[in-house]
């Protein structure tokens, strides 16, 4: 009976000592958190291993992440994975689709993003661009003659139109002089002509008898306007004037219309402010609808694919510029010892318990061996 009690005692003590020793060793990894002193003498094994080596741990964790976890090869392999690319493209298409089907107005979106001033800036910028383009255009064309400034097609159209213009002028003139207003105007012109020529009027009156001068002149004027020779004469005159105009400088236009007036007139016609305001009052969906399908089906996949290709080619440079090791090191360095302990224990809690139990098991086995040795020695 005493023999079995001795074996049980040695086994129990061995298990307790083994389990407690391992448990204490695990605790000494983290505790105490700070060095302990007896007088000026620092107690050995204080602080615990991890608090004492926390800075080194932070550095090593940073190196481990960069050298073994987030490696350029691993990230590059992920970026070139076909399933990953499909998933990313699908996600991008869904998100872009949500934005492009938004029924809120562009103005509301700008206000929401606190960039409502964009409307004023856009209006000013567009007007400034228009002004600069007009001034540059005028600056260039003011150095040309009309012949140089106008395209060849315009020259042809004008020259082909001159006979038609002559016919139109003569037709309108004929209609005018056939009317009562035209006859009255012609009569006044004749009266004014003979007003200072009294003797000539009496002489003409002797030849015409009771018929008024205007009744004789009006048919002749209309007849003259209807003759082919008159049309050719007017056509030749217009052609000569056109030839003269082609040789004149465009800059002469500035004497009739100032540059500022041209710019102002164009800006008034364009109505930049009203156009921008009308554009911003449209919903995002209205603005994007004409190009929505093209953007989602073609542009988004293309952009994502090119972005992933660029990322794959430059992943090493990106990681170097991110300084991930330093980021991990800085983050770990900011952890309190308690948080670091909780973090490690949350990952290795079960394994550390098993180490404690293993220590108890080994201690118990050693106790059994001791008990057997005592039995044989007796």
From Swiss-Prot:
Topology of the protein relative to the lipid bilayer: Multi-pass membrane protein
Subcellular location: Cell membrane
InterPro entries noted in UniProt: DUF445, UCP032178
N-terminal signal peptide: none
One Pfam family in the UniProt entry: DUF445
Transmembrane spans: 1-21, 357-377
UniProtKB keywords: Cell membrane, Membrane, Transmembrane, Transmembrane helix
Organism domain of life: Bacteria
Main location group: membrane
A GO cellular component annotation in the UniProt record: plasma membrane
The family this protein is said to belong to: Belongs to the UPF0754 family.
Name of the protein in question: UPF0754 membrane protein BCA_0919
Species annotation: Bacillus cereus (strain 03BB102)
The organism's taxonomic lineage, starting at the top: Bacteria, Bacillati, Bacillota, Bacilli, Bacillales
């Amino acid at each position: 009976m005493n023999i079995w009690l001795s074996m049980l005692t040695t086994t129990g003590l061995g298990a307790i000592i083994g389990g407690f020793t391992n448990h204490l060793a695990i605790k000494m990894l983290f505790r105490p958190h700070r060095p302990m002193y007896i007088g000026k003498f620092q107690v050995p094994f204080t602080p615990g291993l991890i608090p004492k080596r926390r800075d080194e741990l932070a550095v090593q964790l940073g190196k481990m992440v960069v050298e073994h976890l987030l490696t350029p090869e691993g990230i590059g392999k992920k970026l070139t994975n076909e399933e990953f690319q499909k998933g990313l493209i699908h996600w991008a298409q869904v998100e872009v689709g949500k934005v492009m089907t938004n029924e809120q107005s562009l103005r509301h979106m700008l206000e929401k993003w606190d960039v409502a001033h964009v409307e004023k800036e856009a209006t000013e910028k567009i007007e400034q661009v228009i002004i600069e383009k007009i001034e540059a255009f005028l600056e260039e064309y003011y150095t040309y003659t009309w012949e140089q400034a106008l395209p060849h097609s315009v020259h042809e159209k004008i020259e082909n139109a001159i006979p038609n213009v002559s016919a139109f002028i003569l037709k309108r003139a004929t209609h005018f002089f056939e009317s009562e207003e035209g006859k009255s105007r012609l009569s006044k012109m004749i009266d004014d002509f003979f007003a200072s020529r009294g003797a000539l009027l009496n002489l003409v009156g002797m030849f015409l008898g009771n018929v008024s001068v205007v009744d004789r002149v009006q048919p002749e004027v209309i007849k003259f306007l209807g003759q082919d020779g008159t049309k050719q004469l007017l056509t030749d005159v217009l052609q000569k004037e056109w030839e003269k105009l082609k040789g004149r400088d465009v800059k002469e236009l500035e004497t009739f219309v100032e540059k500022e007036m041209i710019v102002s007139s164009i800006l008034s016609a364009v109505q930049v402010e009203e156009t921008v305001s009308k554009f911003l009052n449209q919903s995002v969906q209205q603005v994007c609808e004409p190009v929505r399908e093209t953007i989602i089906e073609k542009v988004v996949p293309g952009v994502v694919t090119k972005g992933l290709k660029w990322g794959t080619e430059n992943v090493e440079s990106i990681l170097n510029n991110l300084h991930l090791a330093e980021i991990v090191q800085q983050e770990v360095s900011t952890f309190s010892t308690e948080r670091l302990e909780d973090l490690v224990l949350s990952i290795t809690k079960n394994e550390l318990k098993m180490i404690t139990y293993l220590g108890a098991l080994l201690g118990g086995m050693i106790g059994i061996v001791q008990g057997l040795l005592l039995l044989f020695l007796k």
